[in-house]
């Protein structure tokens, strides 16, 4: 072979792979205006001692089953708008006439915001204003919140330790109490909770005809083993702990933010036991707050980061695997070897096909704050973090339509494919962790996200 021929071979062998030709483009984030008025001025430093005393008096009266109006008047007279966070906390528990109306008026007096006109509740617009303003709380606010919240659920006390990574301003009650049942306990919570489903039996796909082909499942694949979790069961339990392949998984489903995720619960330092995920009954900007039953460590459900407790101190971030939202019929075609959770969940329960009905038809029912206007609030997207750290959002309907038309969708070295009729993301080394969520949820955790557009 001539020297020229050798050189040509080397050049060709070392040439970079061609950049894939992807359809569409990405919309970058920009600053956007909100409908909220200017925030009220707030002082620095501690609360006035008189206001602190009035807060204490009001809390004592609530603990005793009353509501001391004079103490509320004294709080308003103090004129410190930072206390609006505490008033909003109380508005979650006192709604409608009586104390609820008094709290709404007090909030309006301190902040200048109008929140009483909302036909559903003054609580939601009140917190939305505070989030939009990013109004600071005072040092000690979390402990006052602790005094109120532990009246409702004493087990929440373990979450309110000092020096945690929880922004307590954003945490609110989700309307249920803590699920603290031991792993494998199938008894209902005596005081009401969202009960996790632990190690449910599964059946082969050809025995899963009890679930309609056009209904949604959340599909997970580990070690080439595929499992379908029916959406109607996930809407009831919102948390499943099980083993798939060689891995132990905790799979939360936040119905309020449209997001099912799968965490490797053995991905903790060796001094800790396998994490057992449970639903706390609390929310943060409409996203469920989950925790580890063994250590009472709070986790960020969207990121898997431990925010408190021993796992928070160890800076644990649980590893994730992808979850695909697909119809059952199409998932079976793509994964004929898939299994599906048994019809009764292994607990003898009958599940309605649509347990939540039209609950979310009118938008988020809990505070979320301002939402990036690039997409509608509850548009479903598949979110993924690119290899260069850039967050990406692929609107589900538009992306699926483009792929069905035979075009390619992706970003740099990532490509989106159909999986069933859901979406998965694949990189140079195989599948990349991705999951579906409502736009408001993905964008509030990843405000710098790029949005794909056809």
Question: What spans do the regions from the language model cover?
Answer:
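Mid-to-C-terminal functional-domain signal that highlights helix-capping/loop sites
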Residues: 20-64, 70, 84-454
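C-terminal motif of bacterial Sec signal peptides marking the signal peptidase cleavage site
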Residues: 11-13
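Bacterial signal peptide processing site
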Residues: 15-18
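Sec-dependent signal peptide recognition
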Residues: 1-9
């Amino acid at each position: 072979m001539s020297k020229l021929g050798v050189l040509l071979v080397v050049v060709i062998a070392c040439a970079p792979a061609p950049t894939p030709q992807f359809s569409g483009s990405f919309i970058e984030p920009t600053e956007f205006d909100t409908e909220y008025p200017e925030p009220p001025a707030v002082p620095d430093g501690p609360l006035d001692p008189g206001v602190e005393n009035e807060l204490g008096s009001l809390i004592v009266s609530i603990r005793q089953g009353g509501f001391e109006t004079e103490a509320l008047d004294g709080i308003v007279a103090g004129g410190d708008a930072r206390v609006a966070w505490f008033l909003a906390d109380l508005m979650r528990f006192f709604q409608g006439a009586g104390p609820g109306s008094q709290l709404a008026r007090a909030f309006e007096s301190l902040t200048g915001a109008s929140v009483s006109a909302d036909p559903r509740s003054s609580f939601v617009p009140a917190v939305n204003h505070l989030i939009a303003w990013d109004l600071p709380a005072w040092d000690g606010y979390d402990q006052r919140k602790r005094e109120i919240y532990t009246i409702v659920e004493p087990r929440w006390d373990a979450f309110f330790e000092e020096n945690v990574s929880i922004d307590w301003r954003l945490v609110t009650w989700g309307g249920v109490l803590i699920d603290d049942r031991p792993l494998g306990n199938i008894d209902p919570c005596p005081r009401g909770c969202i009960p996790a489903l632990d190690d449910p039996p599964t059946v082969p796909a050809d025995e899963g005809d009890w679930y309609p082909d056009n209904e949604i499942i959340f599909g997970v694949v580990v070690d080439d083993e595929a499992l379908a979790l029916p959406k109607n069961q996930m809407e009831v339990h919102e948390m499943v702990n099980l083993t798939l392949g060689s891995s132990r998984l905790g799979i939360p489903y936040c119905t309020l933010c449209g997001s099912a995720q799968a965490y490797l619960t053995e991905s903790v330092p060796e001094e800790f036991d396998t994490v057992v995920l449970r639903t706390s009954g609390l929310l943060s900007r409409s996203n469920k707050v989950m925790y580890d039953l063994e250590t009472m460590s709070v986790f960020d459900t969207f990121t898997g980061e431990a925010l408190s407790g021993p796992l928070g101190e160890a800076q644990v971030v649980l590893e994730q695997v992808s979850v695909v939202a697909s119809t059952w019929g199409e998932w079976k075609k793509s994964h004929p070897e898939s299994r599906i959770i048994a019809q009764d969940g292994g607990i003898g329960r009958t599940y309605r096909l649509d347990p939540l009905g039209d609950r979310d038809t009118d938008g988020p029912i809990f505070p979320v704050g301002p939402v990036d206007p690039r997409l509608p609030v509850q548009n479903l997207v598949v979110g993924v973090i690119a290899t260069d750290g850039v967050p990406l959002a692929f609107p589900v309907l538009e992306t699926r339509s483009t792929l069905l038309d035979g075009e390619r969708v992706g970003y740099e070295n990532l490509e989106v494919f159909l999986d069933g009729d859901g979406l998965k993301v694949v990189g140079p080394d195989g599948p990349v962790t991705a999951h579906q969520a409502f736009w408001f949820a993905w964008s509030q955790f990843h405000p710098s996200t790029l949005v794909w557009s056809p």
